[in-house]
Amino acid sequence: MTDKNLGSELNMVQRFWGRDYVFSPLGDGHVNDTFLARQKGVPELVFQRLNGNVFENVVLLQHQTAQLVTHLSRDANFSERFVVPEIVPSLNGEMGVMHEDSYWRAWRFIEGSLCNERLESIEQVETAAEAFGCFQRALIDFHPESWQLQ
């Protein structure tokens, strides 16, 4: 999804989040463009440009993501076992920013985190399955009406 306007978009991202970052691509970006933002060499945030060709309503998607993250962080059993990602609002308090045709959001960088593109052992499969089961269990009392924008 990368394009020639990426540099100017990343400059815009810095204005909305109010810091001077050095960006580097993060992951393979199968769906979204993802960047690690460092300040003074220290990883701080992860920025994502959501793919509007895949997600028809990126604002609704971000609203739903915020609802899910809030629910998971309030679930003691889940949040004691797993690090729940933290959405970082822009300077004006928005959960994401639409600029021209791109929607950007920011996450707090989770030190030591990794994303396996391919599972290479039965232990990794078992760990992923257990984590997914915990995720499903944490959603038992999640109410779908909260998915809609008010």
Q: What does each model-found stretch correspond to?
A:
Residues M1-S24:
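Juxta-kinase regulatory segment immediately upstream of eukaryotic protein kinase catalytic domains
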Residues V22-Q150:
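Conserved ATP-binding subdomain of kinase catalytic cores across diverse folds
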